[in-house]
Regions:
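Non-heme di-metal
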Residues: 1-167
């Protein structure tokens, strides 16, 4: 990174990403508890929560290594990250106040994961170190896996559209 200002912004962005991943984990743990009577749903929420905790730890590692490993955070995405952070915390507040049914929860989780995946696709962080780059590439792939898992489960429990016979 060039200059203390950019490095400071990069640290803020990395910490914001940590908070986003931690917030996602909290959301999914909450949904696992809300839907505990549906074992498949509870397991899916719990699995996703644990994966988000790993993502949080990955950003925490990036914060610690930022000054030691050549990396660059794209701080131009700060505003977008702040919006995702705000939307996530609004969703978490709503879920805690008014627990959603499973279909609504899945739809909102998919929407949030897509926002996060878009943020990650814009390459928030670039590493020159191959090992670090691979770890973050795995994070980006995991975003797509989360979306796919949630979408498949939603499709499996959603009723078919009216007027079209079920197959």
């Amino acid at each position: 990174m060039n200059g203390a200002v950019n490095n400071s912004k990069a640290h803020l962005l990395a910490k914001l990403c940590m908070e986003i991943e931690g917030g996602c984990a909290e959301l999914y743990h909450c949904l696992s508890e809300i839907h505990r009577n549906d074992p498949h749903a509870a397991r899916l929420w719990k699995k996703t929560a644990l994966e988000e905790e790993k993502h949080r730890k990955l950003f925490e590692l990036a914060v610690h290594l930022m000054d030691e490993v050549e990396c660059e955070f794209v701080t131009a995405n700060m505003e977008r990250a702040l919006i995702v952070h705000q939307k996530l915390h609004e969703l978490l507040h709503i879920v805690k106040k008014n627990p959603p049914d499973l279909i609504t929860a899945l739809g909102k989780a998919i929407e949030m994961e897509k926002h996060i995946a878009d943020l990650h696709v814009e390459s928030l962080v670039h590493f020159k170190n191959e090992g670090m780059r691979r770890m973050f590439d795995a994070l980006y792939r995991a975003d797509q896996d989360h979306i796919g898992s949630l979408e498949r489960y939603l499709a499996s429990i959603s009723p078919p559209p009216t007027g079209i016979p079920a197959m």
